[in-house]
Amino acid sequence: MVNSVVFFDITVDGKPLGRISIKLFADKIPKTAENFRALSTGEKGFRYKGSCFHRIIPGFMCQGGDFTRPNGTGDKSIYGEKFDDENLIRKHTGSGILSMANAGPNTNGSQFFICTAKTEWLDGKHVAFGKVKERVNIVEAMEHFGYRNSKTSKKITIADCGQF
């Protein structure tokens, strides 16, 4: 299986921040990577475009992917509401690692987070399935709009997304 590359065009309160590209590890984690890829392209009729990063914790991560409710309580995958953890072989080794947000084992949907630091305590609990390939500095810039309580000071939006 080919490791796809997707992109997110990020805005802050409607103003462009930049484009990040993300390599998906479809060779090792195909089901999870395909879910993220399809939600990036919108080919199933629903997508990340227009959704926001609702939770940003500096020195930890930026979380988004709730396109059903913009507050972090919604989740929908291309396989239905939730799907099982595919495998937990990839580690949260540092800034730029893409991982599934979940509410416990086998509760993956659409929500994801991008690490801004090494987060080894998440190893074995969250499926890491990609890495920011270009412009990790955009993700690091997003951190400036987050607080320790996970709230954001500005609206950070995925203005556009797709596959290269």
UniProtKB/Swiss-Prot annotation:
Q: Which organism is it from?
A: Homo sapiens (Human)
* Protein name (record): Peptidyl-prolyl cis-trans isomerase A-like 4C
Give the top-rank taxon of the lineage listed in the UniProt record for this protein: Eukaryota
Name the principal localization, coarsely classed: cytoplasm
* Gene that this sequence comes from: PPIAL4C
Report if keyword Cytoplasm is assigned. yes
Q: State the remark under miscellaneous.
A: It is one of six related genes or pseudogenes found in a cluster, thought to result from gene duplication, on chromosome 1.
Keyword terms: Cytoplasm, Isomerase, Rotamase
| Family recorded in the similarity comment | Belongs to the cyclophilin-type PPIase family. PPIase A subfamily.
Gene Ontology MF term list: cyclosporin A binding; peptidyl-prolyl cis-trans isomerase activity
Domain named PPIase cyclophilin-type is located at 7-163
